[in-house]
């Protein structure tokens, strides 16, 4: 379980330490990191919005796997479970994933860091639009099972993938709540350049933070790119 993962993380860092002081410092750093994670993890199950966020990230992971991208690189680049601002970071390339209803497509940004390209060579935004369906679709559970199957050839990667799911708050005991079905309608890809409509930290007055806002698709049409461009750059 997630607490075993926490202890394992501490033991691994201690094993890599050369001196007692180094071991103590690393242990304190690990505890601090995990405290922040525990504060954010929803142990009571994922909300609908959290489920949709995870579905979007899983759709992108499957897209990359289906395009023969390195499974190891994909897992290492998946920063969403660490509650970082970007969902994926491949070297200097950041990727933010969004999922919304196909009936009223819009991009919801939850904080000023998500579209901030500081310290990145390039930032992309991918938007998936879905429709609620009764049958012939996929659920969060079925998408996770599909993804696990693709990682099943490597036991270590499969284990790491399951650990990342736990960090996001996905636990087996809540599976019955994750059978809502969706159908993928369309996906959009954008290059988040300097002129892309967004709010970033440097634009905000002192004391203002955690800004949440929506972007209309019509406002970002000129920033559209082909998904192949993203594939080539990561």
Where do the protein language model's features map onto the residues?
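Conserved catalytic cores of phosphodiester-cleaving nucleases, focusing on short active-site segments
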Residues: 64, 88-101
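Nucleic-acid endonuclease domains
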Residues: 1-83, 101-234
């Amino acid at each position: 379980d997630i607490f075993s993962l926490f202890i394992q993380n501490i033991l691994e860092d201690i094993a890599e330490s050369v001196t007692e002081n180094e071991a103590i410092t690393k242990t304190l750093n690990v505890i601090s990191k995990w405290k922040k994670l525990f504060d954010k993890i929803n142990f009571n199950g994922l909300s609908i919005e959290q489920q949709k966020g995870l579905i979007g990230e899983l759709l992108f992971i499957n897209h990359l796997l289906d395009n023969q991208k390195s499974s190891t690189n994909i897992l290492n680049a998946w920063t969403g479970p660490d509650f970082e601002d970007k969902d994926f970071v491949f070297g200097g390339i950041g990727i933010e994933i969004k999922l919304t209803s196909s009936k009223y497509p819009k991009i919801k940004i939850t904080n000023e860091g998500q579209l901030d390209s500081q310290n990145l060579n390039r930032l992309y935004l991918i938007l998936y639009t879905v429709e609620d369906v009764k049958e012939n679709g996929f659920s969060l559970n079925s998408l996770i099972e599909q993804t696990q199957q693709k990682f099943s050839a490597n036991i270590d990667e499969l284990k790491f993938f399951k650990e990342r799911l736990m960090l996001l708050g996905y636990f087996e005991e809540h599976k019955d709540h994750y059978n809502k079905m969706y159908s993928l309608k369309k996906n959009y890809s954008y290059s988040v350049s300097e002129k892309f409509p967004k709010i970033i930290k440097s634009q905000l007055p002192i004391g203002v933070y955690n800004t949440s806002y929506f972007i209309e698709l019509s406002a970002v049409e000129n920033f559209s790119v082909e998904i192949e461009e993203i594939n080539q750059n990561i």
